């Protein structure tokens, strides 16, 4: 599987889809200020550590299992500019997850589904 990069214009199409989870990997403070509607906050450092533990030891954290437990779902990851979310998207895709990332990240998103 590979990580698909989607334009910020396509994000609104996925927001209310029950088979999609949008994951904000920015710091909690930024997430609380503004985010894409219904996005789950899983901070980058935490996600990176959890993914590294899967690769190194085969250990899956409780939170990772709760959030990413369904490999049939599509996971859309985003960060500020799209760089770190692309890295995480590629690692998760290699683990068999259907992942997408937003080109340009949250800064590029100009859609109608923002929670403040």
What are these regions (language model features)?
Residues 1-20, 28-74, 81-116:
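Rhodanese-like catalytic fold shared by cysteine-dependent sulfurtransferases
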Residues 23:
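Active-site flanking residues adjacent to catalytic metal/cofactor-binding acidic residues
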